[in-house]
From Swiss-Prot:
This is Fluoride-specific ion channel FluC 2. It is a multi-pass membrane protein. Fluoride-specific ion channel. Important for reducing fluoride concentration in the cell, thus reducing its toxicity. It catalyses: fluoride(in) = fluoride(out). Na(+) is not transported, but it plays an essential structural role and its presence is essential for fluoride channel function. It is found in: Cell inner membrane. GO terms for biological process: cellular detoxification of fluoride. The keyword Metal-binding applies. The chain crosses the membrane at residues 8-28, 34-54, 60-80, 93-113. The lineage of its organism: Bacteria, Bacillati, Cyanobacteriota, Cyanophyceae, Synechococcales. The gene is fluC2. Na(+) binds at G68, T71. It comes from Prochlorococcus marinus (strain MIT 9313). Keywords: Cell inner membrane, Cell membrane, Ion channel, Ion transport, Membrane, Metal-binding, Sodium, Transmembrane, Transmembrane helix, Transport. Belongs to the fluoride channel Fluc/FEX (TC 1.A.43) family. GO terms for molecular function: fluoride channel activity; metal ion binding.
């Protein structure tokens, strides 16, 4: 029986794919320094990646690795919490609504664009 704390051999490949995708995502995130912008861009890219007929390895590299390190939930929540602590409740709620609305919208748009590139026999 395999040790549950020890990754299986094929999991190493998956971990490397995520790591290789995460490095450029983190570098872009570090340069942009705008939570709303990176979250919206990341949602659009992730929607596209999910919509396109990519192999799971590419989804790990681009979706989990790149988009996962590009986007930020914790910084967004800190920004909202800071607004709330300053008494700017409406601004915090606006930021939450704007980020979620734009994120869902561009993710759906990216998915629909990617879906158009699927062969007709592949889930279309």
């Amino acid at each position: 029986m395999a040790n549950p704390t020890q990754p299986l051999p094929n999991q190493w490949n998956e971990m490397w794919l995520v790591a290789f995708g995460a490095v450029p995502g983190a570098l872009v995130r570090w340069q942009v320094q705008n939570d709303l912008l990176v979250n919206v861009i990341g949602a659009a890219i992730l929607g596209l990646v999910v919509g396109l007929p990519f192999r799971p390895s590419r989804q790990l590299l681009l979706g989990v690795g790149f988009c996962g390190s590009l986007t930020t939930f914790s910084s967004w929540m800190v920004e909202c919490s800071t607004l709330i602590s300053q008494g700017a409740w409406l601004s915090a709620l606006g930021l939450i609504g704007l980020t979620m609305g734009l994120g869902l919208g561009v993710a759906a748009l990216g998915f629909l664009i990617g879906w158009q590139f699927r062969p007709s026999g592949l889930g279309r």
